[in-house]
C-alpha cells in the first residue's frame, strides 16, 4: 500500500486485533444511555446572523470588549461538502456562542474577504475558545485563510481529564453522556451548502446549537467536582444484559408492525411525509449499526471471550467511546470534513488528530460498507434530480429565536432571499438555460418598465380635510393630546388610525413616511384610555429614546429586553406602565405575561413597529417577527397596529397574513419628504474646496461651521478620515465613524453627536442604524451612492423634525467605476446583476437634468406612495434641477431642447457590441471602434467594416456614450464568467432600435444632454463648430462649485450648475434681473413667517434662536438627555417668532406638553431678557396684540394677505418672471386651470397682475359681467355655482372667479366712500364741483410692482370741465354693493331707461364696453349705443 493510497482505520489493521477485541469487550460493559427517545438539545437564545464584513468586524470587537477573564466562547465552523477528489470546501460559517442566551453566526462566504475584526478575535490568545475537534478546526482555518486560531481548549481532552478516561469523544457523544440529551440533526442541512447565501432557519439553528453545546460541555466539566466526576466516568454503568436487549428488540419490532398498519394511502400528500422518510432512513442506519454490534459480539464469544461482570469490563483504563456508535453515519462532522480530508493529502496530514476524523475511523462498519457509502455519494452527485430532491426535503419550520443583524444596505436581504429561491427553483434544477450573454427576456421587460416607471408621478391632494364620514376628535381628545404630547391637533392619517383603534377596535396596517408621526398613532390610545399599550420594536436604542421622551411627558413607560438594567417587570405586572416596549424575542416568550395584563387591566392595543421585518421579502427580515402571528390567536379582542415606513403591496399582504390581522384598515402616506432639498454636483480632488460651499462663517471667532447638524457619508474608511482631517483644519468640531474603529470610540462619537457636542459626523454607511436625531440639517454624500434604496434611507435621516433640510451628493465618474469594481466581489451572480442594475439607476439619477424627486419616487412601485407632496414639485425647494429651470425659464416639456442627436455614433457602438457577440464589457467595443491593436480585440474581428470606424471620436467620448446608452436602457451590463468581469449586451429596446436603424440611411437617436458627452463631442468637432460654441464650453466644463463658502443661501454660480445645453439658455435669460425673482433657500432653518416681518425683526429672530439653542444645550447637559428630546428645533423656531414669556403661552407652541413646559421654563427668561434689550414685542400670539404693534409693516403691505407657497410660486413666475400660464403649467407639472386658480387666489389676496394676460380677455369679462347683472343672478355674487350655470361652458372657472373678485373689490371701495388706496388721489378736482367728479376721467394701470399700485394719469385739461349729473337721476343699480361710488353714463344707460342728458367728456372707455366681436349676447349689449373708437382697459 503506497503513501498515496487512503489510510485504513485502526480497527481494520491486523496489528490492532487485540485492541479491537478489548474494545468489543468494553462495549458490553457500558450502560446503554443512547436511546432514540432522548430529548433533543435546542438553543433557545437569540441568534445574531451577520453576512457583511463591516458588521462582522463591529460585532467581533464588541465581543472582545465585553468578555470577562473567566468567560469562554463556544466555537465551531462549517463548510460545504465537496466530493471531488483533490478538492476541499472552504470554511463558510464561523459560530461563536458567548452565553446561553446569545450566539453569533458569521457567514464568511458572501463577504469580500475575511473580516479583520473577527480575525483579531480568533487570534487573541486571551479569549478562550472551546469545542470538540477544535484543533482540526485550527488547521482548517490556517489552510483556508492563513489564520492561526489561538487560545482554544479541546473539550475531548478536558473530558478525559475530568472523567479520568481516554475516549475519543464527539459533540453528540458528550452531550448524550453528560446531559442525557442528543443533538437534533437532519441530512437535509447537516451536509448542506453552507456557502449559499442566505442560510435557512434550520441551518442557523443547527450551527448555533453546535457552538452552544460546546459552551455547555465546558461549563459542565469545569464545574464538576470529584464525586460528580465519578458518577459520569465511562465504564461505571451497569451491564446491558442479554434479556434486556432482546426485550427491547421485541418491543421495537412490535411497534414497527403496528406502524405499518397505520400508514394511510394518502400519506404522501401530508406535509410531514418528507420528515417521516428521513426518520426511517436514520432508523435503518441505526439498525445496521446494531446488527454490526451483534456480529462483533458473536465473533468475540466464539473466540472464548466471555465477560462475567462490569468489573471485568473495566480493568483497563483505556476504553473506546461506544456512546457514539449509534450516531448517523452521515453526520456533518463525520461526512463533510472527512470527504475533504480523504481527498487532500495536506489537509489529511493536518487533521489526523481531528476528533471527527478519528471517530469516523472507529465506527463499527466494514470496508465494504465504507465503499458503498462513497458509491452512494458519487451517485447522488451525478443524479440531476439530487439537488431538487434535497431541497424539497428541507422543511421551512419557523424558529423564533434568531434575528438578522441590521445593516444600512437594508434591501440586500430581500433580493438575496428572492435570488436564493430562484436558484432553488424547478427550472434551474431541470437545467433550464439562459440566453447568451445573460440576456434574459424578463430583464428586457424590466428595462422597458424602468423607462416608463417615472411616469405618473403626480402631486398628492391636500390631506388637510377630514373624512366627512369620520367624526372629528372631541375636546377631551385634543386636551389629552396637548397635555401629554404638546400638539393642538391630529394629522388626518393619525386621527384615522387612533379613531379606528378607540371606537372600532379594528386592526390597522399603517405605511407612513419617516417624520410623519407614526409613534403618536400607538402612544395616544393607551394614554387616553389609561390602559396599556404594547409596542414591539426591533432596536433597543429606539426603544430607549422613545421611553425617555414619554417619561419627560409624565407618561409611565419602560422597555423589556436583554438590555434592560432596571427591575421594571414588577411594575409592569402591577399595571403601572401605560406604554411597554419589548423586543420581538421577548414577546415570543412572554405571551402569558400579555394575557395576564389583558385579563387584569386590559390592553388597549399592540403596536408592531418596523413591521416590514415580518415579511421574508422585506428589506430587513427578522425571523422572530414571524412568531408574532400568535398574538392575534392569543388576544383576539386586542387591536393590532402594524407600522412601517416602507412596504410594497406584496409585503403589506404578507404582513397581514403573517400577523393574522382581521379586516385591517390599511393607511398609506406618500414616501415623499417635501422638506428635503435634493442637490447633485461634481466633486474635485480638493476636499476642502468641495465642502466649503456648505459652510458659513462662525458668528464669534474665526473658522467655519455647518448650518446645523450634518452627516457626511464617504465610500471608504480612508476617505472618511481624509475628510475629517480637512474639516478639522477649517475649525469644525467633527468626528469619524467607521467599522475600523473600536466599539468605545464609535459609541463616544455617537454620544457626542446626539448631544450636539459635535455638529458633524464623517462616516461610512455603518453610521445611522437606529439613530434618532430629528434635527439633522444636512446629509452630504462625498462620493457616488451605490443604490437608490440605501440613498433614500441615508438622506431620510435629515429633517425628521419637519424643518427644511438639504441633501447633497458630490460625485465623480471614478466613484461609479470604483463601485462597479467592488460589485465584482459579490459571489452570487444573480445578486451581482441586480446590484449592477441598481448602480445604473443611481448613475441615471446623478446625471439627470429632470426632477430628482420624481426619479426617487419612481423607484417605488406603489402609485400611492409615489405621489409627491402638494406644492413642492417644480419649485426652487424641490431640487437643483427644478431650481435651474425656474431661473432660466426652461419648460419641463421642452425635452427637444435638452436632447441631442447621437444617432450615428450610437449606431456604431451598439453595432460593435452586437458584432462582438455581446461577450465583452464596454472597453473592447471602444478599442474595436478606435482600431486599436490591443490583444483584447480578437483578430477575427479586425477585418470587419466597423473596425476603426470610430477614430473621429476620442476614447473618452465612446466611454461616456457607452455609459449613457446603458443609463437610457439601450444596453445593459450583466455578470461575466468571473466575479470581476461584466458583459455588455443589448436590451430589447436596444435591439429594436438597431433593427430600425439598419433600414435607415441616417439613424437618429436623441439622448439627454450630458456635460461630459457634449464636452467630449465638442473637443473633436471642426474648428468652426468649436468657435460657434466656444462661449458654451466653459460652462459645460465647469463641474465644480464655487470654492469660497458663502454665508447666504446661494450655493454656486449659475454657470457652474448648468449642463452643456443649458448654458445657451443662460445667455437668453441674462436680461432677467436677479431682484425680480428672489428664491427662497431650502436651507433655512425656518420657514418665512407669515405675514412677512421686517429685516430688523428677522435678524433679531435669528439671533434669539441661536441663544435658545445654547440655553437648550445647557439644560440638556444638566439633565443628561438629548437636546432634541428636550425641545426640537421647530419649537425653538416658534419661540423665536412668537416670543412667549409665560408658561401658558409656552404651552400654545406645537410640541410643548405640560411636563415639557416646566422643563423649558429657563428659556422664557432668555426670551424676556433678549426682548427687553432689543425693544422687541413679546407674546406675539393671534389676538394678543394688534398687527401694527407686533410687526413693522408699511400701510401698503398691510393690504396684502399672505399666500400659500404653491400659489406664491405661480404668482411669482407669472408676474415677476413674465411667464405665460402654459409655461408655468409646464414648469410646475400642473394644469392651466390650477395655475389660473392660483392667480385668482393671488388677486383675491390683494396681489396685482395683468388679468388680460392671465386669460381674462375684455370680451370674456364683459360677457361674465353681463351674466352676473341680468336675472336671475341680479348681481348676487354669493353663489359661484349659480353664476357658473349662466356662463358659457367653454369658459374656465378661474376667469369667472376673477371677475367676481374684481366686482367685489369695486363694490367694497364704493361702499366705503373713500379711495381704495389712500396714498393715491382718485378724484379729479374741478373748480365747479370738486367733490362730485367721478373717477372715470382717469386711466387705471396695474403695474408690475409687489403691491396693487394704481397709477392715475389726468386726461387733457379740455375734457376735465364736466357738467355733473344730479343725484336724483342716478340709476337704481347704484345701490349694488360691487359698484363704484359713481359710474359713467354709458354704464348706467344699460340698466336704466330714463337717463338725464349729460355732456360727456372725451375719454377712453373700458375695453369690455367697446368690443364689436364676441357672441350674440355681447352684440346685443351694443345695439343702443355706438361706442367710441378709442378703446381702453382698466387693466392694460
Swiss-Prot record:
Zn(2+) binds at residues 851, 878-879, 882. Residues 690-842 form the Helicase C-terminal domain. Mn(2+) 2 binds at residue 76. GO terms for cellular component: chromosome; cytoplasm; nucleolus; nucleoplasm; nucleus. A motif (XLM) lies at residues 1422-1436. ATP binds at residues 512-519. Mn(2+) 1 binds at residues 76, 78, 210. Residues 427-473, 1029-1049, 1388-1411 are annotated as: Disordered. Its cofactor is a divalent metal cation; Zn(2+). One of its GO terms (biological process) is telomere maintenance. Residues 51-222 form the 3'-5' exonuclease domain. A motif (KBM 2) lies at residues 1401-1410. The record marks 139, 980 as: Interaction with DNA. Keywords: ATP-binding, DNA damage, DNA repair, DNA-binding, Exonuclease, Helicase, Hydrolase, Isomerase, Magnesium, Metal-binding, Multifunctional enzyme, Nuclease, Nucleotide-binding, Nucleus, Zinc. Residues 930-936 are annotated as: Interaction with DNA. Disulfide bonds: none annotated. Residues 448-467 have a biased composition (Acidic residues). Binds 2 divalent metal cations in the exonuclease domain; in human Mg(2+) and Mn(2+) give high activity, in mouse Mn(2+) and Zn(2+) give high activity. Binds a Zn(2+) ion in the helicase domain. A motif (KBM 1) lies at residues 4-16. It catalyses: Couples ATP hydrolysis with the unwinding of duplex DNA by translocating in the 3'-5' direction; ATP + H2O = ADP + phosphate + H(+). Residues 1098-1177 form the HRDC domain. It is found in: Nucleus. Residues 499-665 form the Helicase ATP-binding domain. Residues 1029-1043 have a biased composition (Polar residues). Multifunctional enzyme that has both magnesium and ATP-dependent DNA-helicase activity and 3'->5' exonuclease activity towards double-stranded DNA with a 5'-overhang. Has no nuclease activity towards single-stranded DNA or blunt-ended double-stranded DNA. Binds preferentially to DNA substrates containing alternate secondary structures, such as replication forks and Holliday junctions. May play an important role in the dissociation of joint DNA molecules that can arise as products of homologous recombination, at stalled replication forks or during DNA repair. This is Bifunctional 3'-5' exonuclease/ATP-dependent helicase WRN.
